[in-house]
């Protein structure tokens, strides 16, 4: 078993200096298990942070087995490639179909391990900062205004209640 993933031009490892449990874990979503990783040239040298998104190779939809690697490469990756000039879209560095002998214990999934038999990896640019959820929670209060009512009273108006002119 290995803690290293061999990509197209780089080697990748999970950044075990990151996270509450020092395991590199960032989040788990509907499509991926996300870890902070380190990207290193094959011959060593500088390391750069990246995001390692481990996605299931196959999912079942209404009893039909769907090849997620094929769907990702044929559909989703093409959309990302078309948007690479847009700076607000994260960059995809690599798509690794076979994880080789890579193995990562993960108590957040039923099988308990991320490996080549069940997952492929999408390597993305790492952008430090708030998650979208954190940002929305922090900024939500700024999307309100106060309207003065009669009798010295005020009313808080949420953004979704603004008129079209505002």
Regions found by a protein language model. Give the residues of each.
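ATP-binding glycine-rich loop module of kinase domains
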Residues: 32-81
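Short, solvent-exposed loop/turn segments that connect beta-strands within catalytic domains
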Residues: 41-48, 101-118
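Conserved short submotifs of the Hanks-type protein kinase catalytic core
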Residues: 114-131
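AlphaC helix of the protein kinase catalytic domain
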Residues: 132-145
């Amino acid at each position: 078993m290995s803690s290293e993933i061999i990509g197209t031009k780089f080697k990748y490892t999970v950044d075990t200096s990151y996270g509450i449990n020092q395991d590199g874990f960032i989040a788990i979503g509907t499509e991926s298990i996300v870890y902070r990783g380190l990207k290193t040239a094959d011959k060593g040298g500088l390391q750069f942070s990246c995001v390692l998104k481990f996605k299931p190779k196959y999912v079942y939809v209404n009893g039909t087995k769907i090849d997620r690697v094929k769907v990702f490469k044929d559909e989703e990756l093409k959309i990302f490639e078309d948007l690479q000039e847009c700076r607000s879209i994260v960059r995809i560095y690599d798509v690794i179909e076979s994880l080789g002998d890579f193995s990562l214990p993960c108590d957040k999934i039923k099988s308990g391990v991320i490996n080549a038999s069940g997952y492929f990896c999408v390597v993305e640019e790492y952008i430090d900062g708030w998650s979208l959820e954190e940002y929305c929670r922090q900024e939500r209060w700024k999307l309100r205004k106060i309207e003065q009512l009669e009798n010295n009273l005020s009313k808080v108006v949420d953004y979704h209640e603004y008129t079209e002119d505002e």
